[in-house]
Structure formats: C-alpha cells, structure tokens
C-alpha cells in the first residue's frame, strides 16, 4: 500500500 505524498494538491 502506498500513501500519497504530502506535496500532492487536495
């Protein structure tokens, strides 16, 4: 499982 990067826009 992968979490989205904290830099991705909402």
From Swiss-Prot:
Alphabetically ordered keywords of this record: Hypotensive agent, Metalloenzyme inhibitor, Metalloprotease inhibitor, Protease inhibitor, Pyrrolidone carboxylic acid, Secreted, Toxin
A biological process (GO) of this protein is: regulation of blood pressure
Identify the domain of life.
Answer: Eukaryota
Provide the positions where the record notes the PTM Pyrrolidone carboxylic acid: 1
Tissues of expression: Expressed by the venom gland.
Provide the family line: Belongs to the bradykinin-potentiating peptide family.
Query: What is the recorded function of this protein according to its Swiss-Prot or TrEMBL entry?
Result: This peptide evokes transient hypotension (-11 mmHg) similar to that evoked by 0.5 ug of bradykinin, when injected alone into rats. It has a high bradykinin-potentiating effect (101%), when 60 nmol of BPP-10f are coinjected with 0.5 ug of bradykinin into rats. It inhibits angiotensin converting enzyme (ACE) activity with a K(i)app of 2.32 uM.
* Protein name as catalogued: Bradykinin-potentiating peptide 10f
Taxonomic source organism: Bothrops fonsecai
Upper lineage is: Eukaryota, Metazoa, Chordata, Craniata, Vertebrata
